C-alpha cells in the first residue's frame, strides 16, 4: 500500500508525474518448429487486444482513474498494443458537452496520464526457446499512484521475469510556496509487493534515491520444468533431454534477468 506523507495543502493542482514501467517475460520450450508456431498462436490469442484492454481497464479502476479514451490494435503476424488515456477526475460531463469538447479534453491529457501495453512474442530459430514479453507503462499526474496496480499486473500475466522502474518527476507547491518533489514514502518498489509475490521471487534493487528513481528486477525462485514445456511433459523425456532443456531454459532466464548474453 502506498504510504502518503502528511497531507499537504497545495497551491492549485498536484503536478507530480509518477511513472511505472514493467517488462514482463514468459519463457517456454517448444521442441519443434510446429510447436513453436502453435505457442506463438496461443500467446497471440491469450493476450490479444481485447484481453489486454480488460487488464488495463482493471488497472485504471484499481488506481482510481477515469478512462477518457481507449485505442487498441492486434498486429499481423503477432503482437498487440493498447493505450488508455486516463485522468484523476472526470474531465467533462458528456451530457453537457458536444463531441468537440470531449475530444479536446482527451488531447489535453494525452501526455500526462496514460496506461499502455505492447506485446512481443518471439522464438529461437534452432534451440526451441520461445519467449513472450509484455511492456506496460502506467503514467499518472496528480495524487493517483500507479504502484497500487503492481500486484494485479504481476498476477494477470505469466510472469517468469519482471523488471520494474518507477520514477517521480516534477514538483507540487504548497500554499506557503514550498516545492515538494514527492508526496509519498518509498525506499523500494518491493515495499508495495504482496507477501505471497515476494515469497515466490528472487529480487534485486538498484535505486537512486536522490533522483526519485527506483528499479527492481525479479525472477521466480522455483524451477519446475513442466511449467516451461509447451505441449510436452517432463516425464516423457529422457534424463539427457531434461538436463539439456533445463540448461537452455535457465540460461535464457538468467540472460533476460541480467539483460546481457552470458559467455559460453
Curated annotation (Swiss-Prot):
Binds 1 pyruvoyl group covalently per subunit. The active site is at 113 (schiff-base intermediate with substrate), 118 (proton acceptor), 141 (proton donor). It catalyses: S-adenosyl-L-methionine + H(+) = S-adenosyl 3-(methylsulfanyl)propylamine + CO2. Pathway: Amine and polyamine biosynthesis; S-adenosylmethioninamine biosynthesis; S-adenosylmethioninamine from S-adenosyl-L-methionine: step 1/1. The modification Pyruvic acid (Ser) is found at residue 113. Keywords: Autocatalytic cleavage, Decarboxylase, Lyase, Polyamine biosynthesis, Pyruvate, S-adenosyl-L-methionine, Schiff base, Spermidine biosynthesis, Zymogen. The record marks 112-113 as: Cleavage (non-hydrolytic). The keyword Lyase applies. It is an enzyme of class 4 (lyase). The keyword Lyase applies. InterPro entries: AdoMetDC_fam_prok (IPR003826), S-AdoMet_deCO2ase_bac (IPR009165), S-AdoMet_deCO2ase_core (IPR016067). Catalyzes the decarboxylation of S-adenosylmethionine to S-adenosylmethioninamine (dcAdoMet), the propylamine donor required for the synthesis of the polyamines spermine and spermidine from the diamine putrescine. PANTHER family: S-ADENOSYLMETHIONINE DECARBOXYLASE PROENZYME. Heterooctamer of four alpha and four beta chains arranged as a tetramer of alpha/beta heterodimers. HAMAP family: AdoMetDC_2 (MF_00465). This is S-adenosylmethionine decarboxylase proenzyme. It comes from Stenotrophomonas maltophilia (strain R551-3).
